[in-house]
Amino acid sequence: MAMATRAIRYQLPSPRFRAPRCESSEPIKQIQIQQRPRGGDLAENGKIVLQPRLCTLRSYGSDMVIAKKDGGDGGGGGSDVELASPFFETLTDYIESSKKSQDFETISGRLAMIVFAVTVTEEIVTGNSLFKKLDVEGLSEAIGAGLAAMGCAAMFAWLTISRNRVGRIFTVSCNSFIDSLVDQIVDGLFYDTKPSDWSDDL
């Protein structure tokens, strides 16, 4: 029994098609990637990148530029100056003038205490009372001197207090005063007291 012979043909797979490389004369540009510094590098460089945060009312109000009494903005620039609330500006002037008046009242009170102490000391040492020698004419002179001192104190207070600016307190509407008061209360209760207290978690 004869067996038929078969020719076995092997065909190698054709290589994949490769796109021709286009060689250009232009140099290849190198891109430099800056790496973000780690926690150790931050301490050496001394630069800390803070995370974005929401601005509170107190921190926003701290950046407000307040005009001085002489018309300057304090920054040396000629741009428009954003004025603060007229109520708080008037209140500040009133507090300053009250401090000046309080100093005068303190000095006057101390002088009166010194005079009274000298009178009592003289009466104890010499035994002579100054009040027994006073008659109607002396009482009238003492009352006149007291009224003169009161008039001088009133004149001094009148000159130190800015009458026009203090009068603005009564012209401020009730709604604006309540709004500013509520704003200060809410800001003090629910927001940070100092922007410097913020700490960045590295």
UniProtKB/Swiss-Prot annotation:
A GO molecular function assigned to this protein is: chlorophyll binding
In terms of domain of life, where is this protein from?
A: Eukaryota
Reply yes or no: does the keyword Transmembrane apply: yes
Task: Give TM segment ranges.
Answer: 111-131, 142-162
Q: Transit peptide: where? A: 1-60
The keyword Nucleus is annotated on this UniProt entry: no
Q: Where in the cell is it found?
A: Plastid, Chloroplast thylakoid membrane
> What does the record note about the induction of this protein?
Present at low levels under low light conditions, but accumulates under high-intensity light. Induced by UV-A illumination. Fades out upon wounding.
Keywords assigned: Chloroplast, Membrane, Photosynthesis, Photosystem II, Plastid, Thylakoid, Transit peptide, Transmembrane, Transmembrane helix
Q: Which GO terms describe its cellular component?
A: chloroplast thylakoid membrane; photosystem II
Q: Which family does it belong to?
A: Belongs to the ELIP/psbS family.
Q: What is this protein called?
A: Stress enhanced protein 2, chloroplastic
Protein's organism: Arabidopsis thaliana
Classification of source organism: Eukaryota, Viridiplantae, Streptophyta, Embryophyta, Tracheophyta
Gene encoding the protein? SEP2
